[in-house]
């Protein structure tokens, strides 16, 4: 009986603390979020993470308590405070979802996931310089080659009236391109199928660690990330669910394409005398590039065509601009495409309206800081969701409309700082310029070679896709008719 009284007393004490004494008790949010991370678990399992973030902020305001020790912000100033250079002193990824997942998967030695400032100090100039060199020398050639080979393999345009899965085509040439630039080889389709689970496994694992955060500090879970992962695997095994591992997966470097990131990193590290940077670290960073090109860009390239095909007036304007850029597809160099304002506006608008990265993976952990006048105690997680910022009426005119024209004119009605898909500060994506190059070439070449007609017009991105930590299942089916009798492959 005494034990029951003690348990009841503890529960009452917890209830009083969470409701009245907790430093976050005054922050608005769902009632259950004061006790359990119900928001995150529900968002991840329903596949509506970005839509739910937006709904929460529309309901509760610019700062929302989404868990017992987690806040979500929806302002540009919060974005600057958390992710900017000054934020590096006040916030860390150690103990965040990203930190725990990277430790569990063995990718914590990558530039984006490293928690040590010394590691990032060594890796950033190494990776940034090699990416820039690769972009200048071979990345453009690889973009053309990967797309051309897949157009030929799919016989795109051979029958102008037969619909094709444009999204599947995009997946396959991005997989080839990812392996070319990262490891110097062509990625086989069988390898792509085995790689896909590595993209999807973090979402259910993150739900599990969110539950652990109720009972243990974030730093403790970070320290025992591999143990937490093994426990999660055991639970899934008992429940007869797949136990696909997060192991670091590589494809042997057969150097079909000698100019690749892995080889350049090894040469640059040797030249700089960085003997303490292991080959495993270089492999991990090369794998991260492969994941970035295939595992995140797949959604973005599909989203570009999803919105263009649903807005024929935008597609028509883009066609006119691209077709006037050269007399043949071979003339569509990135130097030329970078000067096409509407092409770049279409890409930027897609980044705004349908960003690849969301608040679920952009989480940081406070070291004790104030954000937008709200004190965030040490150990409390914070996030700013790109989708919510990109769809905010506070920063955009007609935020739900796909309107590339907004990027061609300066206006007080649009705050462009509310769309920064590659982050800012010391953890800004080092492959930003390569990503723009890739999108320009791939989108422009397809638009130049084919007129397109959407087939699956009833597909809805909000209703029919699954948006966890990785936005997936965006399907675009179209009829591609060659503009000339001579196909571009």
Swiss-Prot record:
- InterPro entries given in the database record: Cyt_P450, Cyt_P450_E_grp-I, Cyt_P450_sf, Cytochrome_P450_monoxygenase
Q: Which Gene3D superfamilies match?
A: Cytochrome P450
Name by which UniProt lists this protein = Cytochrome P450 monooxygenase bfoB
Q: Where does heme bind?
A: 429
What superkingdom does the record give?
Answer: Eukaryota
Can you tell me which residues are glycosylated? 113, 348, 386
Q: Which organism is it from?
A: Aspergillus brasiliensis (strain CBS 101740 / IMI 381727 / IBT 21946)
Q: State its cofactor.
A: heme
Leading EC class:
oxidoreductase
The protein's job, in short, is: Cytochrome P450 monooxygenase; part of the gene cluster that mediates the biosynthesis of bifonsecin B, a dimeric gamma-naphthopyrone. The first step in the biosynthesis of bifonsecin B is the production of gamma-naphthopyrone precursor YWA1 by the non-reducing polyketide synthase albA, via condensation of one acetyl-CoA starter unit with 6 malonyl-CoA units.
The UniProt entry's sequence similarity note says: Belongs to the cytochrome P450 family.
UniProt keyword list: Glycoprotein, Heme, Iron, Metal-binding, Monooxygenase, Oxidoreductase, Signal
Gene, per the UniProt record: bfoB
Q: What is its EC number?
A: 1.-.-.-
Q: Does the keyword Glycosyltransferase apply?
A: no
């Amino acid at each position: 009986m005494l034990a029951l009284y003690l348990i009841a007393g503890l529960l009452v004490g917890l209830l009083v603390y969470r409701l009245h004494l907790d430093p976050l008790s005054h922050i608005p949010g769902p009632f259950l979020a004061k006790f359990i991370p119900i928001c995150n678990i529900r968002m991840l399992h329903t596949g509506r993470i970005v839509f739910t973030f937006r709904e929460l902020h529309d309901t509760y305001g610019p700062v929302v308590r989404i868990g017992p020790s987690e806040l979500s912000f929806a302002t540009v100033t919060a974005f600057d405070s958390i992710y900017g250079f000054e934020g590096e002193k006040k916030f860390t990824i150690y103990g965040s979802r990203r930190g725990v997942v990277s430790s569990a998967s063995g990718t914590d030695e990558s530039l984006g996931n490293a928690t040590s400032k010394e590691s990032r100090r060594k890796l950033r100039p190494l990776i940034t310089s090699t990416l820039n060199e690769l972009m200048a020398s071979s990345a453009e050639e690889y973009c053309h080659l990967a797309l051309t080979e897949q157009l030929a393999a799919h016989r795109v345009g051979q029958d102008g009236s037969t619909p094709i899965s444009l999204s599947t085509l995009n997946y396959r040439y991005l997989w080839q391109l990812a392996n070319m630039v990262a490891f110097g080889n062509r990625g086989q389709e069988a390898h792509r199928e085995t790689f896909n689970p590595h993209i999807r496994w973090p979402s259910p694992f993150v739900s599990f660690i969110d539950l652990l955060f109720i009972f243990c500090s974030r730093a403790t879970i970070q320290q025992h990330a591999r143990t937490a992962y093994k426990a999660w695997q055991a639970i899934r095994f008992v429940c007869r669910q797949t136990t696909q591992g997060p192991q670091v997966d590589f494809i042997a470097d057969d150097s079909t394409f000698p100019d690749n990131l892995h080889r350049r990193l090894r040469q640059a590290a040797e030249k700089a005398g960085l003997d303490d940077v292991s080959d495993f670290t270089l492999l991990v960073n090369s794998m991260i590039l492969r994941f970035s090109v295939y595992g995140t860009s797949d959604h973005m390239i599909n989203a570009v065509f999803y919105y263009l095909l649903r807005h024929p007036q935008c597609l028509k304007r883009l066609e006119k601009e691209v077709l006037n850029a050269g007399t043949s597809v071979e003339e569509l160099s990135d130097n030329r495409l970078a000067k096409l304002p509407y092409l770049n506006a279409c890409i930027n608008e897609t980044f705004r309206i349908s960003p690849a990265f969301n608040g679920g993976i952009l989480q940081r952990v406070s070291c004790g800081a104030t954000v937008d006048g709200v004190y965030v105690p040490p150990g409390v997680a914070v996030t700013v969701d790109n989708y919510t910022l990109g769809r905010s009426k506070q920063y955009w005119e007609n935020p739900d409309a796909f309107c590339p024209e907004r990027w061609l004119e300066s206006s007080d009605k649009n705050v462009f700082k509310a769309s920064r898909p590659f982050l800012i500060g010391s953890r800004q994506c080092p492959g930003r310029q390569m990503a723009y190059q890739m999108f320009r070439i791939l989108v422009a070449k397809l638009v130049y070679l084919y007129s397109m007609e959407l087939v699956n017009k009833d597909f809805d991105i909000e209703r029919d896709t699954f948006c966890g930590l990785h936005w997936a299942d965006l399907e675009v089916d179209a009829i591609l008719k060659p503009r000339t009798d001579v196909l571009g492959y």
